[in-house]
Regions:
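Feature captures hydrophobic
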Residues: 1-164, 168-170, 176, 183
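Conserved class I S-adenosyl-L-methionine
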Residues: 185-193
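Conserved SAM-binding loop of SAM-dependent methyltransferases across substrates and taxa
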Residues: 196-207
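Conserved SAM-binding loop
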Residues: 224-225
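A short acidic, Gly/Pro-enriched loop at the edge of an enzyme's catalytic core
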Residues: 245-254
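A short glycine-rich, Lys/Arg-flanked "PGG" loop and its adjoining helix->strand segment in the class I
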Residues: 269-281
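Conserved beta-strand signature within the Rossmann-like core of class I S-adenosyl-L-methionine
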Residues: 282-290
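Substrate-binding/catalytic lobe of Class I Rossmann-like enzymes that use SAM or dcSAM, i.e.
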Residues: 290-402
């Protein structure tokens, strides 16, 4: 029997009635909540949408949602307090519309203040930036190579049809960056945040560019250097284990692929001033950046979400309007931008499928079920944010005035 109201129901988990009442504001989709005693409660919006089910294993989940907001609920998932047969469907439902279900559950002030303090302590000065990057990217090259495509690219691909391979779509993204930047054969370009060297290899091999790539991840530097040596491109590509703020000289162009998100809001002016200083007069930089919708900016900037706590400590996304303001304040001109959020949704879904297909091999490296739940939560939450338009990804091209 499916229940649609808590009226007359006894022995409900603490705060469940309050949570269920708030969920009745859902406009689209359907959510079933199965309690430990077998009772199933259903909320259904008037409009069609994702259909999801949540199985509650720890009755304290609802108290944590009220007390701690989104982070409390996500923490409970990592700890096995609740589960769902289709995490992607649940995330699609949660992020549907102009707001998220979590907006009604902001958490208590002291909990919010504590998480903001933790986030502040992870701000990206030079020392902390290296720690923050290592936290994520130094999980191991073998780990990432299991579920990324052959290019070892950990950023959004650019799909044309959605049917092509991830490798082909990643190469299309690289091509777009060079095209938008306007780099010509023989030019010397700077890549701020070179990852595992995929873009640098493409730029040198396919577009005859010289590339200087910067990273503060020891693991990435090792992999990228070996990759370029194997490709016979060491005369064209140089990698440095160096903070972007310490680079000197000027370049014919700059590429930066989803590195800005790790900079931290305090250092956005420094980042764009560095871009300006490193460009030759009249030269362009094309920056691939994840953005949070303008309508979500106030809620987002004043909180700490799951991604900031567990995946990218110290990270912060800009809103499109804020991003353009920062660029202009640095004395750079916005030339154009290309948005392709649906491609990121598809990229994340491909990663999710491959990660889970390869889970036995990932587990053999020492990663446990809690890590699996964390990674799946991260991939599906991000995918849903792009699918619903709460987040987008842009290749924004800026120029240094002559």
């Amino acid at each position: 029997m499916i229940l649609t109201t808590t009226e007359g129901q006894k022995n409900l988990p603490r705060y469940f009635s309050q949570v269920f009442k708030m969920l009745q504001r859902m406009e689209s989709g359907r959510l079933d909540i199965a309690l430990p005693d077998g009772r199933v409660f259903r909320n259904e919006g008037a409009k069609p949408g994702p259909v999801a089910r949540v199985d509650i294993h720890d009755p304290d989940v609802f108290a944590r949602l009220i007390r701690e907001g989104e982070l409390g609920f996500s923490d409970a998932y990592l700890e096995g307090g609740w589960s769902t047969p289709d995490l992607r469907a649940f995330m699609d439902l949660v992020h549907l519309g102009t707001e998220t279900v979590y907006d009604d559950f902001t958490g208590k002030f002291l909990v919010q203040a504590y998480e903001r303090l933790r986030f502040w302590l992870h701000r990206n000065n030079r020392k902390q930036a290296k720690k923050n990057i290592s936290y994520h990217y130094d999980l191991g090259n073998d780990f990432y190579s299991l579920w990324l495509d052959e290019t070892m690219t950990y950023s959004s691909a650019l799909f044309e049809t959605g049917q092509e391979s991830l490798e082909k779509a990643q190469t299309a993204k690289y091509a777009s960056l060079v095209d938008e930047m306007g780099a010509k054969p023989g030019d010397h370009i700077l890549e701020i945040g070179c990852g595992w060297g995929g873009f640098a290899e493409y730029a040198a091999k396919e577009r005859d560019l010289r590339v200087t790539g910067l990273t503060i991840s020891q693991e990435q530097l090792k992999y990228a250097t070996q990759r370029i040596e194997k490709a016979g491109l060491s005369d064209k590509v140089t990698f440095k284990l160096q903070d972007y703020r310490d680079e000197r000289g000027q370049y014919d162009g700059i590429a930066s692929i989803e590195m800005f998100e790790a900079v931290g809001q305090k250092y956005w002016p420094v980042y764009f001033q560095t871009v300006r200083d490193r460009l030759k007069p009249g030269a362009r930089a094309t920056l691939q950046i994840i953005t949070v919708a303008d309508r979500r900016w106030d809620v987002y900037k004043n909180g700490v979400d799951f991604i900031q706590k567990y995946i990218f400590p110290g990270g912060m996304l800009p809103a499109p309007t804020v991003l353009r303001q920062e660029i202009q304040q640095a004395g750079l001109d916005v030339v154009k931008s290309k948005e392709f959020g649906p491609s990121y949704d598809l990229t994340l879904r491909r990663w999710y499928d491959t990660f889970n297909d390869k889970w036995d091999q990932v587990a053999a490296m020492g990663f446990d079920e809690r890590f699996r739940r964390m990674w799946n939560y991260y991939l599906t939450a991000c995918g849903a944010a792009f699918d619903t338009g709460n987040c987008d990804v842009t290749q924004i091209t800026v120029a240094k005035p002559n």
